[in-house]
Amino acid sequence: MVQDETVEQNWYEDDNEGEVGYSFKEYDVTSTPNDFNTKTIIDFIESGLFKIPGFQRNYVWDIKRASKLIESLIIGLPIPQVFLYEEGKNNYLVVDGQQRLLTIYFFSKKRFPKKDKRFELRQIFEENGKFPDEYLYNDDYFDDFKLKLNDTTILEKNKLHGINYATLGEFKNSFDLRTIRNIMIKQNFPSDDDSAMFEIFNRLNSPKLSSFYTLHFNFFRICF
């Protein structure tokens, strides 16, 4: 157990030590934009249409950062687009945007993963394609997800602070129907590998990767 926790802590590092190397290669890639609302995204995650590939890191956001994303969606501010790689028909791997997608999913379930359980939860998700209810509603693994937001001014409290998905009230439709841009990527050439997925991930994320995670990503790319 101590070993797992040590590994998990390394996944949270956030330094700028080096970039992942790559070889020069030309690609033929089709990129298709799609705007999905949050309810559709939640359905896609639950049905296994959106998958988290093995080279992705754990869920690392804290409750404050997660709450700011949900607040942005509710009040109508744009958030960064999500990149998805088409591995097969109705089968998409999340290249960039895992933290945002899982935050939306967790909020809809009114549950937030405990930091010391995220390494184990990652394995559970990979094995099941989702978070089974026996874990999702187990207080040993998850806390209640209530928005944790700062007051808007000294004299005015943030009206969204402390609420969860069930208590959104007048804001529920705003959250449920808010659309997020998703870029669906399909590699046409080369046709014998998925290397475009790794290159896109590398170029979007390499400045944010820890030295531990860079080694993990390189190993996964070589093996697969």
Enumerate the predicted regions with their spans.
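N- or domain-start disorder-to-order transition segments that initiate the globular core
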Residues: 16-49
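Basic- and aromatic-enriched surface patches that contact anionic nucleotides/nucleic acids
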Residues: 4-7, 12, 24-32, 55-60, ...
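Short Pro/Gly-enriched beta-strand edge/turn motifs at strand-loop
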Residues: 47-52, 63-65
